[in-house]
């Protein structure tokens, strides 16, 4: 089976925060799981280096857009690597390859008659002497009356045009823009109305899109899909490949989602492999992003794929809700965020991955609290999982000289482990990652109870053979926990496998156990709860 996984492309205009990771982490869990199953996986993403936010940030700082993009693209790569993300291709939208691929997509849509020219009115800033596309205009959403950008309202998810906004202001200078006529290319989105409607009916029946994606897309379809501009007067981006229009750029909403396609083609060129299997109707496709990106993946990208004759429309949309921080809405402008480069300096990446999975905003907004983060690490990772692994392996080291005693796997435990692979796998495939991880940790707590009830410290004196059986079965559980937890907690899983000299990562019960263990080290360290006050103080600016 061919599995294509696309992670949303973060704007390279500032550091990643935990809100980004909360929405993107499911992609890596899926990729690791399907690879362990032996499936053919292509997992791609990249940095959005062409968007308006980069141009605005560059102008504000008095540097080039390229300098801003380079800085954050490199930082993103480090953060994703340090968090254990296993992209097969992580690229950038200002690469020559991406530009060429997107231009081919544009020309194909033009040739098929899905793109046409139209004279329209557009916001124009007299002070900056330039047209103001999408995010260059800010104001009030006409639907919910919350603050919004010219491309979309985060509060109600409405897709907007800058002229839709009330109380419009130029993002660069704050002046009120005028309205001027200009010519742009438009995508005939309305022609895909019935096809998109059919797609939504199918995924709703199968339950393969998150509810928020289904509900929002149903709303768009009910209102009637509207044609959208595919060109903008932007300083950076992919140039329109039509003579006389080279100064205009392909609008980011079509250019960015086409990044999945360009990354796939780039991977194929780099590896010498064929990527077409990921774009046919048999491919299982997963698109992983936050709810603010739903319309781009549930309406626009399927329409583009249909327009260029590709069959692999989004089978699964994994669109998480928002993550708040200490009960407040995350705000990068107010520095109310937990920044990824910062948290990685002091905390285990598996602790971050664990918390953002068991507290994932899968169906509703959830909160990141430093108190809950640190207590979950100490009680679950250290107190439950780490404790079971450490007490078992230290017992072997102390009483058996590092030699794993011989024994046979208890039928009850074997059945339990086989059931875990089945149920956890099903939950992952259904994008219920929280359920999957909680199911494993229920088994971890069962394992600790098993150890306590068997009392190997007493068995060693009273019944040495039973003690060996107990420890052998505990090693069996540990080996399989490492396998089962690998998609979620790859770093600690690798440490366990190294200690047990286990190489295989297949998604199936690990029945062959090692004869000895090497260098037992604590799987996790306790975090001092005094850190809670320190971290919250930093967030409020009281601590530097």
Curated annotation (Swiss-Prot):
It is found in: Cytoplasm. ATP binds at residue 332. It is an enzyme of class 6 (ligase). Its main location: cytoplasm. Binds 1 zinc ion per subunit. GO terms for molecular function: ATP binding; metal ion binding; methionine-tRNA ligase activity. It comes from the Bacteria. Zn(2+) binds at residues 141, 144, 153, 156. Keywords: Aminoacyl-tRNA synthetase, ATP-binding, Cytoplasm, Ligase, Metal-binding, Nucleotide-binding, Protein biosynthesis, Zinc. A motif ('KMSKS' region) lies at residues 329-333. Its cofactor is Zn(2+). PROSITE patterns: AA_TRNA_LIGASE_I. It catalyses: tRNA(Met) + L-methionine + ATP = L-methionyl-tRNA(Met) + AMP + diphosphate. One of its GO terms (cellular component) is cytosol. One of its GO terms (biological process) is methionyl-tRNA aminoacylation. SUPFAM superfamilies: Anticodon-binding domain of a subclass of class I aminoacyl-tRNA synthetases, Methionyl-tRNA synthetase (MetRS), Zn-domain, Nucleotidylyl transferase. Belongs to the class-I aminoacyl-tRNA synthetase family. MetG type 1 subfamily. Is required not only for elongation of protein synthesis but also for the initiation of all mRNA translation through initiator tRNA(fMet) aminoacylation. Monomer. This is Methionine--tRNA ligase. It comes from Bacillus cereus (strain B4264). The gene is metG.
């Amino acid at each position: 089976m061919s599995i294509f996984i696309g992670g949303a492309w973060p704007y390279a205009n500032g550091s990643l925060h935990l809100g980004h990771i909360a929405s993107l982490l499911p992609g890596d869990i899926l990729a690791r799981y399907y690879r362990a199953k032996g499936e053919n996986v292509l997992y791609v993403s990249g940095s959005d280096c062409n968007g308006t936010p980069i141009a605005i940030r560059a102008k504000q700082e008095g540097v080039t857009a390229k300098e801003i993009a380079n800085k954050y693209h490199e930082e993103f790569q480090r953060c994703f690597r340090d968090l254990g993300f296993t992209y097969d291709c992580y690229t950038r939208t200002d690469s020559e390859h991406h530009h060429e691929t997107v231009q081919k997509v544009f020309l194909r849509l033009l040739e098929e008659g899905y793109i046409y020219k139209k004279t329209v009115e557009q916001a124009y800033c007299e002070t900056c002497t330039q047209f103001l596309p999408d995010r260059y205009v800010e104001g009030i959403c006409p639907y919910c009356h919350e603050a919004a950008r010219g491309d979309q309202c985060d509060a109600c998810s409405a897709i907007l045009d800058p002229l839709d906004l009330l109380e419009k202001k130029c993002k660069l200078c704050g002046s009120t823009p005028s309205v001027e006529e200009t010519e742009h290319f438009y995508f005939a989105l309305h022609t895909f109305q019935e096809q998109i409607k059919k797609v939504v009916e199918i995924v709703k029946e199968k339950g393969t899109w998150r509810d928020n994606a289904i509900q929002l897309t149903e709303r768009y379809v009910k209102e009637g899909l509207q044609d959208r501009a595919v060109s903008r007067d932007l300083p950076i981006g992919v140039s329109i490949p039509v003579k006389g229009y080279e100064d205009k750029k392909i609008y980011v909403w079509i250019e960015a989602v086409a990044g999945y396609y360009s990354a796939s083609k780039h991977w194929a060129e780099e590896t010498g492999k064929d990527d077409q299997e990921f774009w046919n109707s048999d491919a299982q496709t997963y698109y992983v992003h936050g709810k603010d990106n739903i319309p781009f993946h549930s309406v626009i990208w399927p329409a583009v794929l249909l327009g260029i004759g590709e069959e692999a429309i989004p089978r699964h949309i994994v669109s998480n809700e928002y993550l708040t921080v200490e009960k407040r809405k995350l705000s990068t402008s107010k520095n109310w965020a937990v920044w990824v480069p910062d948290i990685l300096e002091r905390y285990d990446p598996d602790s971050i991955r664990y918390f953002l999975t068991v507290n994932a905003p899968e169906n509703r907004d959830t909160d990141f609290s430093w108190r809950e983060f640190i207590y979950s690490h100490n009680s679950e990772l250290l107190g439950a999982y780490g404790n079971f692994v450490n007490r078992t392996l230290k017992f072997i080291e102390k009483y058996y000289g590092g030699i794993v005693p011989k024994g046979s796997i208890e039928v009850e435990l074997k059945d339990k482990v086989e059931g875990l692979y089945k149920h956890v796998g099903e939950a992952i495939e259904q994008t219920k990652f929280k359920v999957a991880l909680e199911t494993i940790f229920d088994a971890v707590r069962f394992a600790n109870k098993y150890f306590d009830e068997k009392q190997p410290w007493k068995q060693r004196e009273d019944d040495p053979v039973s003690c060996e059986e107990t420890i052998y079965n505990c090693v069996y559980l540990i080996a399989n926990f490492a396998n089962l937890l690998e998609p979620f907690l790859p770093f600690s899983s690798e440490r366990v496998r190294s200690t047990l000299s286990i190489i295989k990562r297949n998604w199936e019960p690990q029945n062959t156990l090692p004869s000895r263990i090497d260098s037992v080290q604590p799987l996790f360290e306790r975090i001092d709860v005094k850190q809670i006050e320190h971290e919250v103080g930093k967030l409020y600016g009281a601590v530097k």
